[in-house]
Amino acid sequence: MKNINIKILITLAILVTSLSIEAFAQTGGNWPQWRGANRDGISKETGLLKQWPADGPPLAWKTSGAGGGYSSFAISKGRLYTMGLRGDKEYVIAFDVATGKQVWATPHGGAFRNDRGDGPRGTPTIDGDNIYSLGGDGDLSSIEARTGRLNWTMNVLKKFGGSNIVWGISESPLVIGEKLLVNAGGPGASIVALNKKDGSLIWKSQSDRAGYSSAIPVQVGNTTQVVFFTHTRGLGLDLKDGKLLWEYPRAANNVANAATPVVRGNRVFISSDYGNGGGLVEIGADGKAQEVYFTKDMRNHHSSSILIGDHLYGFSGGILTSMRFDTGEVAWKDRSVGKGSIVFADGNLYALSENGVVGLVEVSPAGYKEKGRFRIPQDSLPTWAHPVVAGGRLYLRDQDTIYAYDVREK
């Protein structure tokens, strides 16, 4: 009788564990593309820890197999997607969010190699049943999310006559409706809109060299614009036909323009580092943009700023900075975490520094207030893959290794 009861308890424990994993897979959060659903770095998660334990939040799982590179994560329907270099090929890889186990891995292009680190830089974009990914050497692919089956692939540099940039193509593709948009950097085809179903060309525009930034849409009246940050300028194009509506070269540093522009209403903040700065432009009813201000107090390098309330929060060089969006007035600056990248969730910034330190920082223009920190246990440095908060977990990547931390408030 005692043995039967033990067997029943073991069976129940296995059943509960299985149900918990299945439930998590169904509610494991939604982060479908670079910087989240709206490309703004803001997670809709609530019920998260307001203060971390001394050694940081508990580790839910850790897995290897992400490969080399700095690709961040896209998360949907219980799957986490990223890209990585394995051997001489770049792969799009799917992991189970509940366990960290690999579901599939699909090769989609050749290896990008560089003295600042090999492998892909961009993040996959989930749209419906498919994933769109752009590798470090310009390989663009459409892959079925459930199975990993390759729908189509092309090299945008070869297709449109562009040449790779110094530290590799770093863009995360933008999907709007039927259009798949990328900064291909070719003559007469700097920006291309492709049919997401088969990769066929819808329109092409401009001749700028590619930048490292990822695009973002902005709605002005009845017109949807797409804002790109190329090698030489920020610019707004009409989504319908690629017509140039405005340009803003002052924000560009002509070295590495990497930050994604920040949008609120008809205003767009565009920023770069290498001693340059950032500017706010306002788009009028005619679709043209005028500068509101330019400042050297917010110089985004790899990491984009996040707009929360009336203030931008971002790394200006290596200094975490809070600045009023409409005026450029600085609220505070702090060096405590060090240079890195950020994501926002439930009242706090999750800051990942290049040296592997992770900080929880309360969002307030009143001043810097840290609520906990820890260091990822193994780091290859620099940790450039941007953090993600989804489904009550903080996801971090250090090259081949992915960490999932439970940040839910118990």
Give the location of each predicted region:
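N-terminal secretory signal peptides that target proteins for export/translocation
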Residues: 1-6
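Bacterial N-terminal signal peptides
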Residues: 9-22
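Noncatalytic, solvent-exposed loop/strand surfaces
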Residues: 24-410
